[in-house]
From Swiss-Prot:
SUPFAM superfamilies the UniProt entry points to: D-ribose-5-phosphate isomerase (RpiA), lid domain, NagB/RpiA/CoA transferase-like
GO process annotations (BP): D-ribose metabolic process; pentose-phosphate shunt, non-oxidative branch
Catalyzed reaction equations: aldehydo-D-ribose 5-phosphate = D-ribulose 5-phosphate
Natural source organism: Methanococcus maripaludis (strain C5 / ATCC BAA-1333)
Involved pathway(s): Carbohydrate degradation; pentose phosphate pathway; D-ribose 5-phosphate from D-ribulose 5-phosphate (non-oxidative stage): step 1/1
Top EC class of this enzyme: isomerase
Job of this protein: Catalyzes the reversible conversion of ribose-5-phosphate to ribulose 5-phosphate.
Source species taxonomy: Archaea, Methanobacteriati, Methanobacteriota, Methanomada group, Methanococci
Binding-site residues for substrate, renumbered to this chain: S40, G41, S42, T43, D96, G97, A98, D99, K110, G111, G112, G113, K137
EC number in record: 5.3.1.6
Gene Ontology molecular-function annotations: ribose-5-phosphate isomerase activity
Name of the molecule in the record: Ribose-5-phosphate isomerase A
Family statement: Belongs to the ribose 5-phosphate isomerase family.
Length: 239
């Protein structure tokens, strides 16, 4: 008897297949006895699952450093031993996703899931920071389609909003589904999303972080390599 499709069944998309393709490729880059930064988000979760398979099948000794409660749960389910940032002297490689990737500079916008602060701490601490993306995430310039998220201390949200308004932007407090009120990060802070023109990623990153009350923003100016899933192959972009 044929199974009746339910309304909430997830149907794999072309984007999903491209994400899985780059996740599998990235998992092959991890070597035995490495400490790996585990990013957050749908693509990073696929990488975590593929890495877990390798650990089990090849009996590898690998430790993961999660960047969110979500990545911690996915890694635990995948069988990846976890350690905290203060337990590891070095992180050999960090693998994460992105919301936008600038083709010419490999700068990024991250934080659609509200995890960018802990992601940036881990990603920037790693010896090598690798980003996974499907070809739909590539852009000529950052910020035209995707807002930059700012993690903001709740005490300062109104002053941060006022500062952003004076910069001729249109900031918005991020609200969530399943609860009333603003999205609250794993660290207990709020998210303000703002569309802003980004000509120089490092300059914008530093400028936004200099606003009192902003803990961290979603502009990532540092990235070593991007694995891009296309319909034909996985392309590798390097600086």
């Amino acid at each position: 008897m044929a199974r009746t499709k339910k309304a909430n069944d997830e149907v794999p998309t072309n984007s999903d297949s491209l994400k899985l393709k780059v996740a599998k490729q990235a998992a092959k880059l991890v070597k035995d006895e490495m400490v790996v930064g585990l990013g957050s988000g749908s693509t990073a979760n696929l990488f975590i699952q593929e890495l877990g398979k390798r650990i089990v099948e090849e009996e590898l000794y690998i430790y993961g450093v999660p960047t969110s409660f979500d990545s911690r749960m996915v890694a635990s389910t995948a069988g990846i031993p976890l350690i905290s940032l203060d337990q590891c002297g070095e992180i050999d490689i960090a693998v994460d996703g992105a919301d936008e990737v600038c083709k010419s500079t490999l700068s990024l916008i991250k934080g659609g899931g509200g995890c960018h602060t802990m992601e940036k701490i881990v990603d920037y601490h790693a010896k090598e920071f690798i980003v996974l993306a499907d070809e739909g995430k590539l852009v000529d310039s950052l910020g035209d389609k995707t807002p930059v998220p700012l993690e903001v201390i709740p005490f300062a949200y109104s002053t941060v909003l006022n500062k952003l308004l004076k910069m001729n932007t249109a900031p918005a407090i991020r609200t969530g589904s399943g609860k009333m009120g603003p999205v609250i990060t794993d660290s207990g802070n709020m998210i303000i999303d703002v569309f802003i023109s980004i000509d120089d990623a490092e300059e914008t990153e530093n400028m936004l972080n200099n606003i009192p009350g902003v803990l961290e923003n979603g502009v990532f100016s540092k990235c070593d390599k991007v694995l891009v899933g296309t319909s034909k192959k996985v392309e590798i972009l390097k600086k």
